[in-house]
Regions:
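Residue-level marker of beta-strand positions
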Residues: 66, 83-84, 100, 147, ...
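C-terminal capping/lid region of NAD(P)-dependent oxidoreductase domains
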Residues: 290-300, 311-335
Length: 335
């Protein structure tokens, strides 16, 4: 099969993406062989590219996909050949920037019928991250009448997290943005209040007169952590998804703040007993998209998968100015 990978880790200038030919991996008992029609770019793509040196062949990135099931493993029960699926994959396996891809059915969902393949590929990773952060890491319940602060509301995770919080809970949603276009996008996603994270966020929150019980720190956690401790309710909860260089959480002791990480690959990496929860939530998100309850967060289709378009997608991701999601058409796209 054809695939796109890089040969040298490091900066984007060093990342020599090439198209090459490689074998299709063998199916495991719960695996699907998917013909890939759409992929997307996430921060994990650029993080891996900077840190992971390929070994015997170029490293294939890509942690979102939508496509058609072409073959199933012996124990597969959730899907059949010909089904259209979408998923975020497993960081321990080769990525989705290829003609075909192997994925466990337990972390795969039915593709939203209302979205194109490329648009559907922009949904899984951010939806899983947002869902797990909201309900597992923060422990929010449907009838919760508290408030949540989402730092970095205009990115891929923030865009879907705002919607999930508004549609599935009673939370008041405060989201941060720093530019006019990102502020407008966050408002479009449904945020009740918007603050500017280029200013001290504890002062911004104080001016609102709201003390959030929950904080979702999606970016700049090390920069904002002291302010988070100041603004959060006693016995509140903080969940983060970024990679702060150093974080002293002792300042949260007096308020008995609950602190947790969200990493959506945990279930697949460790094959947890509940990894099927990702299959279930992706199906629910798919239904919500098809019923108009959720809206797509995709803002740009960068064209067909190639070394050139991958480099452009990585450049945009690393600019720090991404709103929503960037997607690419797969090798099999007719566009």
């Amino acid at each position: 099969m054809k695939a796109i990978g890089y040969q040298t880790m490091g900066s984007l200038a060093q990342a020599d993406f090439i198209e090459f030919t490689t074998d299709i991996p063998e199916l495991g008992a719960h695996d699907l062989l998917v013909e890939v029609h759409g992929v997307s770019i996430n921060p994990v793509d650029t993080n891996v590219r900077r840190r992971a040196q390929p070994e015997q062949q170029p490293k294939i990135l890509g942690y979102d996909a939508a496509g058609i099931v072409k073959q199933v493993g012996l124990n597969v029960s959730r899907f059949a050949v010909g089904d259209e699926v979408y998923y975020a994959g497993d960081i321990t396996r080769p990525g989705t920037n290829s003609e075909f891809h192997i994925v466990d059915e337990r972390i795969t969902g039915k593709k939203p019928s209302s979205l194109s393949m490329a648009e559907a590929a922009g949904i899984p990773l951010t939806s899983i991250t947002a869902w797990e952060l909201l309900f597992d890491s923060l422990g929010v319940t449907a009838n919760d009448n508290e408030s949540i602060l989402i730092i970095g509301g205009a990115g891929g995770v923030g865009s879907i997290l705002i919607q999930l919080a508004k549609k599935l809970t009673n939370l008041t949603v405060i989201a941060s943005a720093s530019r006019q276009e990102s502020t407008e996008w966050v408002k479009k996603m449904g945020a009740d209040h918007i603050i500017n994270h280029s200013k001290p966020i504890d002062r911004e929150i104080e001016e609102l007169g709201i003390q959030p019980k929950y904080v979702a720190a999606l970016t700049g956690t090390d920069e904002h952590f002291d302010a988070i401790v100041n603004l959060i309710k006693p016995r509140g909860s903080v969940a983060i998804i970024d990679n702060p260089e150093a974080l002293n959480i002792n300042s949260g002791k007096q308020k008995s703040i609950r602190f947790s990480w969200e990493f959506m690959f945990t279930r697949s990496m460790f094959e947890t007993a509940d990894m099927d929860e990702q299959h279930k939530l992706l199906n629910q998100v798919s239904d919500m998209l098809d019923n108009g309850i959720l809206r797509s967060t995709v803002t740009n289709n960068l064209g067909k998968l190639s070394p050139k378009t991958i480099v452009e997608a990585h450049r945009r991701q690393e600019s720090g100015r991404v709103i929503g999601k960037n997607v690419l058409e797969g090798f099999f796209s007719n566009l």
